[in-house]
């Protein structure tokens, strides 16, 4: 008795196949210009956040929460850059494709994609975010923190 040959494309439901095809189809839209701009942005600072709005005026609750978490962790403003994806539709779609992450905000530390608001919140609760930011030397030096508190 012969077993039928396994065909991975046929074994998935039509909906999953359509989603997979759409994901690959969408990848064609990331131009080299946008890819280069994103790479340059990620390299601009040790901590980089792609968000809706600005740190002073976030335009969504998730961006506001992420900015709050980074502030509570003590991220040094001199080692932080934020990019407002609402100013550029190509950047907004491009960063999602670049990271293969569907939502904004998106956090990068030392050029490595960390995650969105849910991941950052979880990492903050567990202490992983503080450790990561400390390793990246992205926190305000303790002497400056003591001066601020006075």
From Swiss-Prot:
Function: Monothiol glutaredoxin involved in mitochondrial iron-sulfur (Fe/S) cluster transfer. Receives 2Fe/2S clusters from scaffold protein ISU1 and mediates their transfer to apoproteins, to the 4Fe/FS cluster biosynthesis machinery, or export from mitochondrion.
Keywords: 2Fe-2S, Iron, Iron-sulfur, Metal-binding, Mitochondrion, Redox-active center, Transit peptide
Residues bound to [2Fe-2S] cluster: 60
GO molecular function: 2 iron, 2 sulfur cluster binding; disulfide oxidoreductase activity; metal ion binding
InterPro entries xrefs: Glutaredoxin, GRX_PICOT-like, Monothiol_GRX-rel, Thioredoxin-like_sf
Coiled coil: none
The name this protein goes by in its record: Monothiol glutaredoxin-5, mitochondrial
Ligand binding (glutathione): 52, 92-96, 104, 117-118
GO cellular component term, pick one: iron-sulfur cluster assembly complex
Subunit structure: Homodimer. Interacts with SSQ1. Interacts with BOL1.
Species in which this protein is naturally found: Saccharomyces cerevisiae (strain ATCC 204508 / S288c) (Baker's yeast)
Transit peptide per record: 1-29
Further comment found in the protein's record: Present with 6260 molecules/cell in log phase SD medium.
A Gene Ontology biological process term: iron-sulfur cluster assembly
Domain of life: Eukaryota
Subcellular location: Mitochondrion matrix
Phylogenetic placement of the source organism: Eukaryota, Fungi, Dikarya, Ascomycota, Saccharomycotina
Gene field: GRX5
CDD domains registered for this protein in UniProt: GRX_PICOT_like
Family note: Belongs to the glutaredoxin family. Monothiol subfamily.
Residue intervals of the Glutaredoxin domain: 35-140
PANTHER family xref list: GLUTAREDOXIN FAMILY MEMBER, GLUTAREDOXIN-RELATED PROTEIN 5, MITOCHONDRIAL
């Amino acid at each position: 008795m012969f077993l039928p040959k396994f065909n991975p494309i046929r074994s998935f439901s039509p909906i999953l196949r359509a989603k997979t095809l759409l994901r690959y189809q969408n990848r064609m839209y990331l131009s080299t210009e946008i890819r280069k701009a994103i790479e340059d942005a990620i390299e601009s600072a040790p901590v980089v956040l792609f968000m809706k709005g600005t740190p002073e005026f976030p335009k969504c609750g998730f961006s506001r929460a992420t900015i709050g978490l980074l502030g509570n962790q003590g991220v040094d403003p001199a080692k932080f850059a934020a990019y407002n994806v609402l100013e550029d539709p190509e950047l907004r779609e491009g960063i999602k494709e670049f990271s293969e992450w569907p939502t904004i905000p998106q956090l990068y530390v030392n050029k490595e994609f960390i995650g969105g608001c849910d991941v950052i919140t979880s990492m903050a609760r567990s202490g992983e975010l503080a450790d990561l930011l400390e390793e990246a030397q992205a926190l305000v030096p303790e002497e400056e923190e003591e001066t601020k508190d006075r």
